[in-house]
């Protein structure tokens, strides 16, 4: 999967289209990512010792990795490729040629 935790991405599809944010978690087995402030859902929590009333909590839901594009250091969104530099496999932006890792 081409997206890693900590990458700055732009959402390219869905209700949050155009939003730029940081990846909080990558879920490679299901090809999804959790992006900060994107895809917010309301989760109903049952009452417990910490919160005897229960609560409605807003949290980020995973979105499919095909709906985001990684931004390079200049803030340009583009596709990601892999190449070997000094014997190490690194990610690079196909648009600018800039190495991301």
UniProtKB/Swiss-Prot annotation:
Belongs to the universal ribosomal protein uL24 family. GO terms for biological process: translation. GO terms for molecular function: rRNA binding; structural constituent of ribosome. CDD domains: KOW_RPL26. Part of the 50S ribosomal subunit. This is Large ribosomal subunit protein uL24. Keywords: Ribonucleoprotein, Ribosomal protein, RNA-binding, rRNA-binding. One of two assembly initiator proteins, it binds directly to the 5'-end of the 23S rRNA, where it nucleates assembly of the 50S subunit. One of the proteins that surrounds the polypeptide exit tunnel on the outside of the subunit. SUPFAM superfamilies: Translation proteins SH3-like domain. The keyword Ribosomal protein applies. GO terms for cellular component: ribonucleoprotein complex; ribosome. PROSITE patterns: RIBOSOMAL_L24. It comes from Streptococcus pyogenes serotype M1. InterPro entries: KOW, Rib_uL2_dom2, Ribosomal_uL24, Ribosomal_uL24_CS, Ribosomal_uL24_KOW, Translation_prot_SH3-like_sf. HAMAP family: Ribosomal_uL24_B. The gene is rplX.
């Amino acid at each position: 999967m081409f997206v890693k935790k900590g990458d700055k991405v732009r959402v390219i599809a869905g209700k949050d289209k155009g939003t730029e944010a940081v990846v909080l978690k990558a879920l490679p087995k299901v090809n999804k990512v959790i992006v900060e402030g994107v895809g917010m859902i309301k989760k109903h929590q049952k009452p417990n010792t910490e919160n005897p009333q229960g609560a409605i909590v807003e949290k980020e839901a995973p979105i499919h990795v095909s709906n985001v594009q990684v931004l390079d250091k200049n803030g340009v969104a583009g596709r990601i490729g892999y190449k070997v530099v000094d014997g190490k496999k690194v990610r690079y932006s196909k648009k600018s040629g800039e190495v991301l890792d």
